[in-house]
């Protein structure tokens, strides 16, 4: 999966 932010997913 890809998140718009380079942070840990919720």
From Swiss-Prot:
- The residue stretches assigned to a coiled coil in this entry are none
Drop me one GO molecular function for this one: toxin activity
User: Which keywords does this chain's UniProt record carry?
Assistant: Pyrrolidone carboxylic acid, Secreted, Toxin
The free-text tissue note of the record is: Expressed by the venom gland.
**This protein's GO CC annotations:** extracellular region
Modified residues annotated as Pyrrolidone carboxylic acid in this record:
1
Q: Where in the cell is it found?
A: Secreted
UniProt family annotation: Belongs to the bradykinin-potentiating peptide family.
Q: What does this protein do?
A: Bradykinin-potentiating peptide. It inhibits the activity of the angiotensin-converting enzyme (ACE) by a preferential interaction with its C-domain. It evokes transient hypotension.
Name of protein: Bradykinin-potentiating peptide-like
């Amino acid at each position: 999966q890809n998140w718009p932010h380079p942070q840990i997913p919720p």
